[in-house]
Regions:
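Intrinsically disordered, low-complexity segments enriched in polar/charged residues with Gly/Pro
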Residues: 2-3, 74-76, 87, 100-106
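A glycine-rich, often tryptophan-bearing local segment used as a flexible ligand/cofactor-contacting loop or short
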Residues: 2-80, 128, 142, 146-148, ...
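A generic local structural motif
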Residues: 11-12, 85-86, 112-113
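Extracellular ligand-binding/catalytic regions of CAZymes and related secreted enzymes
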Residues: 50-51, 95-170
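Active-site Gly/Thr loop motif
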Residues: 84-94
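Generic detector of bulky aromatic hydrophobic side chains
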Residues: 28, 87-88, 132-133
Length: 170
């Protein structure tokens, strides 16, 4: 949102997509004095960050669909992350967002806004300050599992998930 000058024009169209059943995932944005409207509901991005790559990540909403499918997310999924956990976490948000994960550097206060999810119309909007741009290229398995859940939210589980039952053609 802070890299495109026309986000004020694009954002309403993006929210219509979400409202109609789409999923939008916004990855971290720098904190700016005049923040554009990012999501369907108010949120304020801070300069909060978690730089210790081994910092504990706590699951705040263990029953949320984002944590339970298609992959069951556990503490194991946060092992092996590289460089940092994340940055530019929101520090204020509308009650219609659900905070999913929390983390903090040693001696710091919890940063509960690292992954926020809101239902909007028929779809889902997510804001994440976690460093997917580092974890996915590094091949961190847990990052792939979590991001898969993010892009799958609201989708029906496939009827046949056993890939071994698919016949191979010669």
């Amino acid at each position: 949102f802070n890299t495109l000058d026309r986000m004020d024009v694009i954002q309403p169209r993006l929210m219509e997509y979400v409202k109609g059943g789409g999923t939008a995932i916004v990855q971290y944005n720098t904190s700016m004095r005049n923040q554009p409207k990012i999501g369907p509901y108010p949120l304020e991005i801070s300069r909060d960050r978690v730089t210790v790559e081994e910092a504990e990540i706590r699951i705040l909403a263990p029953d949320h669909p984002l944590i339970n499918g298609p992959n069951k997310i556990t503490a194991k999924d946060f092992k092996g992350w590289v460089q940092e956990r994340g940055l530019y976490f929101p520090n204020k948000w509308d009650a219609r967002y659900t905070p999913i994960l929390s983390s903090n550097d040693p001696g710091e206060t919890p940063k509960d806004g690292g992954l926020l999810v809101a239902e909007y119309g028929e779809g889902f909007f997510m804001y994440s300050g976690y460093s997917w741009f580092r974890e996915l290229p590094a091949g961190v398995p847990g990052a792939f599992r979590i991001f898969t859940n993010m892009i799958s939210i609201g989708k029906e589980k496939p009827k046949n998930t056993n890939l071994n039952s698919v016949e191979k053609k010669n």
